[in-house]
Structures are given as C-alpha cells and as structure tokens.
A protein has these predicted regions:
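Pyridoxal 5′-phosphate
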Residues: 1-250
Length: 250
C-alpha cells in the first residue's frame, strides 16, 4: 500500500483514516507512521488495523503514533476476541454505538454485557507466551522460514507468487497460483498431502483485482508461524511441486 494512495485522499474534511498494519493476503507492511503523520497534519485521527501485524512484529503505538490500534487474539494463539488500544483521553470524546444499558463513556460503552472471563484468561496466556518466546525472536524465526518458502516457490515452474517477490519488510504471509489449476483445487490437493493452506480472497476482496486475481477465487495463501519448522516448509514445497505435475483432471 503506497503511502500516497492514502495520503492523497486526506483533506480538510477528513476526520478519520483507517489503514491496515499488514495485509492478511500478501503480508505487505505499509509505512503507517508516514500515513499517520500526514493524517494528523490534516487534523484527522488514525486507526490502525493491527490484526495481521501483531503476531509477527513487535508493535509500538508510540512509534506508529496512531490514535487507535485494533487486534484480535485469535491471530496470536488465543481465543477469538477483539482488542482495542485507544489514545488516553480520546475514548471519552467518542460516541460509539452501544447497547442501551451500557455506560455512555469508558471501555464499558464498547462492551455488550458480562465479559468472557475464560476468554480473557486465554488472551492473557497467549500474550504471556509471546513475551516468553520474545517478539524479536519470533520475527527472526519467521523471517528465516519465510525466505526459505519464498525462494522455494520461485524455483517451481508453474507457480506464480502474487505481490512482493522478496521477504523483506513484510509479514510472513504470501499468496500463489499454480498454472492451470484453480486455487480451490490446489488447496484440496495439498490437504490430501496433509498440508494446510487457505484459498480464496481471504476477505481482502478489494485487493484481489489489482493483484491480477479473480475477486472470488483469489489464490492460495500460505504463511509461517512461530512453530513452523524447516521441515514444514520443505513438505509444503514438495507438495506444491507434486500438485504442479498432476494432470488438470486430478
């Protein structure tokens, strides 16, 4: 996401700018600090969608200088839950849609009743896990495995990696196509080989067409996590190479 693609839309009437911290489709990490600076110069607030960024990179709201950061713990080994950091003092000035009995201000205005205490326990455990392993260590581990995956896919004839072609400055997520086979067919064949991937648009529908993909079919998505090993990557590459060699009717 080029900075100018967002900044050029910002004007005197802009009140909020929403930008992704990282693409869940192809892993790109935009220069959110530059976008935030331009938005603030225009008098706008900024909310960063950090759902796909948080599990893969250390996130510092001070460096991002955003007003709101959102994430979800299901992306970092916890339960499904929405988490939002808000610049101190800002929440009191907001008027969110809320259920009638909820308070008019404070965090309670964004909640819908009794919290999921068991979910909060899971979030705490997941956060402790990330901190115990180390966010920098996780990023280094994932980047090394991701480079292995990306280089391996580039070496397989009939495979096209969608989006950026190198492993630098991105989350360890990519999309790829196999010539002559639909993404759904590729995912099914890989599942037969006990390799789990995702296919489709990954809810990033607007990004599919600029990437040269069908808006519904999308592509095959694969990614690296803290527990991914070199062996896992090699199994995926071997399975993809096998899929390429299979006849279309398969």
């Amino acid at each position: 996401l080029p900075v100018e693609a967002v900044v050029d839309l910002v004007g005197p009437a802009t009140r909020w700018v929403a930008v992704t911290g990282s693409s869940n489709a192809v892993g790109t990490i935009p220069d959110t600090a530059a976008i935030t600076a331009a938005a603030h110069t225009a008098g706008a607030r900024v909310v960063v969608d950090g759902v796909h960024l948080t599990p893969h990179r250390p996130v510092d709201v001070g460096t991002l200088d955003c007003d709101v950061l959102t994430t979800s713990s299901y992306k970092w080994y916890g339960p499904h839950a929405g988490i939002m950091w808000v610049e101190p003092g800002l929440l009191e000035s907001l008027s969110p849609y809320k259920v009638r009995p909820a308070p008019d201000a404070g965090p309670g205005s964004l909640q819908y009743g009794t919290p999921s205490w068991e979910g909060l326990a899971g979030i705490d455990a997941a956060a402790c896990f990330l901190l115990d392993v180390g966010l920098e260590e996780i990023a280094a581990h994932e980047t090394e495995r991701f480079a292995r995956l990306l280089d391996g896919l580039h070496e397989i004839d009939g495979v096209r990696v969608v989006g950026p072609q190198d492993a630098a400055d991105r989350a360890p997520t990519l999309m790829f196509e196999v010539a002559g086979k639909s993404p759904a067919a590729v995912a099914e064949l890989l599942a037969d080989a006990q390799v789990a991937v995702w296919d489709g648009h990954n809810y990033a529908v607007e990004a599919m067409i600029p990437l040269g993909l069908d808006a519904e079919d999308g592509a095959v998505r694969a990614g690296i996590s803290v527990y991914t090993t070199d062996h896992d990557v090699d199994r995926l590459l071997a399975a993809v190479a096998d899929v390429v060699d299979r006849p279309v009717s398969a």
